[in-house]
Amino acid sequence: MDKSESTSAGRNRRRRPRRGSRSAPSSSDANFRVLSQQLSRLNKTLAAGRPTINHPTFVGSERCKPGYTFTSITLKPPKIDRGSYYGKRLLLPDSVMEYDKKLVSRIQIRVNPLPKFDSTVWVTVRKVPASSDLSVAAISAMFADGASPVLVYQYAASGVQANNKLLYDLSAMRADIGDMRKYAVLVYSKDDALETDELVLHVDVEHQRIPTSGVLPV
């Protein structure tokens, strides 16, 4: 072997990568990948341009249908004796009721237990006759007929039950905002008396988009 061949062979040997010279992926690399995935999902959500029925006090979320938004109202049941009932009709703000022909697709109820909550309640939403006085007897019959879904929410040691929302689909009924006067949220306190400061119900009514004012109130 002449000198030039020896020099070329030496260079080739030097070009070979050393075993183990590449470092293993660090934890910071893994964290960066996770962050990138989260940002990608966030960008897709923002790009969709649709409101999301979401709230930190309940598990999971539902994205509004295209062309729809939602209006939320809050209900705080009064004290309910053990084995007794409570009912409250859905009263949306006047600014929403003005568009009474806009369709309603879904009603979602989110049960938010306050720190003192230690009871078991059943919650549902029902269409009730205008003549109904939402008496104990009337509400009891509506819970018993099985005509609408019921959420059973009970005390958990952690203070938060895994499932604390009820979704009621009205799409097939062609209900509109004006019909919401005919619906009521019903509560049954099963095993214990429910105190006034134990529970809050967030009711989200998903409906077709309505015009919004471009002028700030005076």
From Swiss-Prot:
Location of the region described as Disordered in the Swiss-Prot/TrEMBL record: 1-30
Record comment regarding domains: The N-terminal arginine-rich stretch does not seem to be the major RNA-binding region that allows formation of an infectious ribonucleoprotein complex.
Entry-linked InterPro entries: Cucumovirus_coat, Cucumovirus_coat_Asu_sf
Keyword annotations from UniProtKB, A to Z: Acetylation, Capsid protein, Ribonucleoprotein, RNA-binding, T=3 icosahedral capsid protein, Viral nucleoprotein, Virion
Function statement: Capsid protein. Probably binds RNA and plays a role in packaging.
Any GO molecular function: structural molecule activity
Protein name, per record: Capsid protein
GO CC terms in record: ribonucleoprotein complex; T=3 icosahedral viral capsid; viral nucleocapsid
Biased composition (Basic residues): 11-21
Subcellular location: Virion
N-acetylmethionine PTM positions: M1
Ribosomal protein is among the record's keywords: no
Family: Belongs to the cucumovirus capsid protein family.
